[in-house]
């Protein structure tokens, strides 16, 4: 990476010899002008514009990879040194607006040139932003940057892991939207749509934009029931796409699901909440810090001491970090892939630990690629969300346990089977649930598993010939088709139980 320093505003990038750039070191102050894109400290003129290394590298990667971005908001995001990573679409547009030239990149040395020329980690100036293996996604390429073949495979493999996780997240989000739209049509009693349908049909490029902004407070048990059923059902389908979940024994599958379920119920709405004033739910409702006064007794008891802590301990750090969805899907996978979950067999622990390590590597490679200067700190701050998440999970379980123990209300059987019941109790794993967990996911996966890109996880299928024996099994046995099975919806609607957030 050459630091071309601006001796004159009339000197163009393609007129500077790479080997003579050091001649200007003593003539100009590289910090005289800030980066034209984000306002951070500049390191010279890059692609015709005074800019920092971060914006230079971002522009170069975007052009070389021909990446296309979308803005989650109104294409008017603020791009400064604090929030430049929040929206890649607006950042790239800012690069173009201030004068960065695509054609200037061709004057640099060919990024896929001889493997004997390239980046160095021994203090020598970098001649290229990335190695041949990175630019081409070729895991066999080895540059002269001192990195071995194993390390060179990290970036392309990590990118595949995150891409697959992102694809499955989008499919789950879309299915949530579809199920909510169907529930609204069913509630209206006519096949027509209501005023919210237009919002619900918005695309699901990201978890934050998959749902319309919430327009009413969550005030009824019906809202909580809908959220819990749909979220837990889709959690199972998502889990079946994560390698090596389908290779585990039935008992280990259920242990892993039970360990993760309460964390999932907290993570999903937390990521979609834009600020610390309210927790946004997928059915266009929200909960505020004092929203529990509008709920009935049991719902208020379950959420009163959880909602404020979710806002302070999960939502606030996410917003401070400007967490991207790529980071969020990795955080979800890390919470799910917990090899220390009580009761797991030794063989399952080994497989789960290997899968978790792949996600950890993918997350760090992504952060290092996008924000190299802040990578260690950002990586650590994301992982530090885990203790708060576990503490909130324990609080949620305690609330449910007290409710069930003192008979304050009937705890919903679906949540009870997922969160409260002992794994050694055979009633927690009825035959129908075992058959469902043994079947391929009903979500379309294109034959790709997030942690095993070359492996097939099965095609779209439905579970038939199963006689549900419990609330959980009845819910899980319902295939996630575009058109819901009326018989399964009837099973769900017939249960008059209570759910938590």
Swiss-Prot record:
A zinc finger (NR C4-type) spans 11-31, 47-71. Residues 114-123, 197-207 have a biased composition (Polar residues). GO terms for biological process: cell differentiation; determination of adult lifespan; positive regulation of transcription by RNA polymerase II; regulation of fatty acid metabolic process; regulation of lipid metabolic process; regulation of transcription by RNA polymerase II. PROSITE patterns: NR_LBD, NUCLEAR_REC_DBD_1, NUCLEAR_REC_DBD_2. CDD domains: NR_DBD_HNF4A (cd06960). One of its GO terms (molecular function) is zinc ion binding. The keyword Nucleotidyltransferase does not apply. Homodimer. Interacts with nuclear hormone receptors nhr-80 and nhr-66; the interactions are direct. May interact with nuclear hormone receptors nhr-13, nhr-22, nhr-79, nhr-105, and nhr-256. This is Nuclear hormone receptor family member nhr-49. It comes from Caenorhabditis elegans.
